[in-house]
């Protein structure tokens, strides 16, 4: 088994504006725009879901500003990732970033104890984070993973 890190440069205000709007038109627009991704999530996690608790339900909860199924926190996290990608673009070469910060999101969703591990950094913090990340020495979460373990 392996892990991957996906980093997105996204418009935080757009992501934040999705949460709690209670806008059925927005739900429908996002369902159409993210259909392939949401269906893929549902297929991948089919053994952990039932018909009421799926990626579409998590999306509706996010837009409606409610969390009906905290037991599938992982799904809220993956749907959040899809929303970030929808309003932004994926960036690469971010393999070690997940070790550097505690989980955070632009919207109040439950965070999984496992995966996905989410770190949302506002633009106003990017320069200080860049300085922090580039000043790290090997062994502090950078270049110290033993792939043979």
Feature annotation, model-predicted:
Residues 1-148:
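Acidic (Asp/Glu-rich) sequence patches and key acidic residues
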